């Protein structure tokens, strides 16, 4: 990958000039000027996903200039580096090949001169065998009973992805009850275990190193809970599996290394649901559906690798995001799925985006002079409409939004889905076009009120509009389409990181807090007054000790 400061490129400077020319143009004007705007500013993937980006504050000229930025920052070269197994995670000297985990074409994927597909396929085969034995009741607990409940213990990428996917694909789930424990707060594991039977519970301990503080604290508490009933440590092997690479620690914990599912250092945590970390997904929806999830992601990988940038959906979304973040000064993006099963999707890509591109040092080791990753947030519709949409519609912040919805519902009750989708369509229309003072006055006139009578309230009913949105309409949320959608966002994040000249696949920002926590933990063991920190931290620790 080339290390190019985007703000010093001629394309960036051209975009600055272009922004000054069009920043005040309203979406109403853009649609009036071009009745076929939707056809020109939308794209379809595999007849499964429609992405409508026409309600963005862009013109054909904007896209040309953004494409020039992608070319000048060598996004094509960055993609080649990603797909070829080059060690583009330079600060950790690692390749980035989560795409190999879902490489259904089985074409060679090289790391250090070795094709990794044999290893990938071996782990997938092991996952298939294990998941099918558990699902079909062949895997027995220590009293001879089958498994009824699966508890995934992990944090970050070892939790967010599997939890999001198992929730999104609940219509495909089998009889197994899935539970996810992540927080080191003892309440999380305690509340989860209350309703479980140790005779029929399987724990998946998801930690690459098997030393992650939060995960191993919860794992040991689960182990203690289990042994209170089982007694014999030999029974641990029937109720615990490890998603890890540290065989020594796994064995010491009591887990049979035959039940250890491996992944590799070229799999980043927030891109790991495609790996052994996805075992909970396979257990929840069955291995065939897990393979469909992989196939959908692989299809999107093929789209990204082989589609010209002018029609390349993740590239287009990445460029539009940079346009708002760096030229309009938008600081956040909202992800708003109109599907209750997708209620963790925004949280998943909050990590996916903010941990990937929340960097202020560029690939040359210098502070950047432009914006990098945005703040990502969101909740399912229509709940959000009754919570924070007020600010999106009439606030002083520009918040680009992704609206996501399936055309076909898994639960076609009465007219629920039509009402849901009517809101989906209405919100993007309202955000784009708003309501003028003239329209407000006309509405009041229709109801028989004069302008004088409503003067005090009319200004508050005006919607400026010109709020940008992408509408992402899926035919139906299936394992395949969800896999493609996730991969679409992954590649959007990668393309933005490539253009912004930052390392997308490390996460050094999480380290300092962990180091300080390890220093503070021993200080909490006694009641002695602490004076080793700043006055604020000392004061907080000492009040905690006094109150506990």
Swiss-Prot record:
InterPro entries: G6P_Isomerase (IPR001672), G6P_Isomerase_C (IPR023096), Phosphoglucose_isomerase_CS (IPR018189), SIS_dom_sf (IPR046348), SIS_PGI_1 (IPR035476), SIS_PGI_2 (IPR035482). It holds the Pfam family PGI. The keyword Cytoplasm applies. The keyword Cytoplasm applies. The active site is at 355 (proton donor), 386, 514. It catalyses: alpha-D-glucose 6-phosphate = beta-D-fructose 6-phosphate. It is found in: Cytoplasm. Pathway: Carbohydrate biosynthesis; gluconeogenesis; Carbohydrate degradation; glycolysis; D-glyceraldehyde 3-phosphate and glycerone phosphate from D-glucose: step 2/4. One of its GO terms (molecular function) is glucose-6-phosphate isomerase activity. It comes from the Bacteria. One of its GO terms (biological process) is gluconeogenesis. Keywords: Cytoplasm, Gluconeogenesis, Glycolysis, Isomerase. Its EC number is 5.3.1.9. GO terms for cellular component: cytosol. Its main location: cytoplasm. Catalyzes the reversible isomerization of glucose-6-phosphate to fructose-6-phosphate. Belongs to the GPI family. HAMAP family: G6P_isomerase (MF_00473). This is Glucose-6-phosphate isomerase. The lineage of its organism: Bacteria, Pseudomonadati, Pseudomonadota, Gammaproteobacteria, Enterobacterales.
